[in-house]
UniProtKB/Swiss-Prot annotation:
Keywords carried by this UniProt record: ATP-binding, Cytoplasm, NAD, Nucleotide-binding, Nucleotidyltransferase, Pyridine nucleotide biosynthesis, Transferase
Subcellular location: Cytoplasm
Pathway the protein takes part in: Cofactor biosynthesis; NAD(+) biosynthesis; NAD(+) from nicotinamide D-ribonucleotide: step 1/1
Name of the protein in question: Nicotinamide-nucleotide adenylyltransferase
Gene Ontology biological process terms in this record: NAD biosynthetic process
SUPFAM superfamilies xrefs: Nucleotidylyl transferase (SSF52374)
NCBIfam families (UniProt xref): arch_NMN_Atrans (TIGR01527), cyt_tran_rel (TIGR00125), PRK01153.1 (NF002243)
Catalytic activity: beta-nicotinamide D-ribonucleotide + ATP + H(+) = diphosphate + NAD(+)
Entries under HAMAP family matching the protein: NMN_adenylyltr (MF_00243)
Amino acid sequence: MRAFLIGRWQPFHKGHLEIIKKISKEVDEIIIGIGSCQKSHTLTDPFTAGERMMMITKTLENYDINYYAIPINDIDYNAVWVSCVESLTPPFTTIYTGNSLVRELFSEKNYNVKKPELYNRTDYSGTKIRKKMLDGSNWEHLVPEEVVKVIEEIDGINRIRRLSEKDYDEE
């Protein structure tokens, strides 16, 4: 069986890894959708699709997991988004998502939809990790070592800090 899992992976963290490891025990192959692939260089989406793909592939090299990592664009037409995903991916029967809109769209197309159990969401949150990066707090323990290396290679911390700078003085 092949399943689809979509996320923004901004950045790919240990919670994501645990979800993928768990799903890999339930299916033969996982299609990892790199969602909102067109977005980058913002505080909520600082990393490009290619950088996120590097984070995922370099991390999963260490695991016996059969997967495809595929960039998926957002489109402003929800009713046809599932068809767009289907055209970009190998066939699959099950989708794992925590997003209520994605659940609804795939349910309407008669897919088997499962909500993955989040792994320690208190610590493993992309929003919190990006905030730690911005604040200069310790974040490295929250992501796989390979992700730390990718972020260092692309100078990701300084990118996030530059993106947070204001072009004007706040009064």
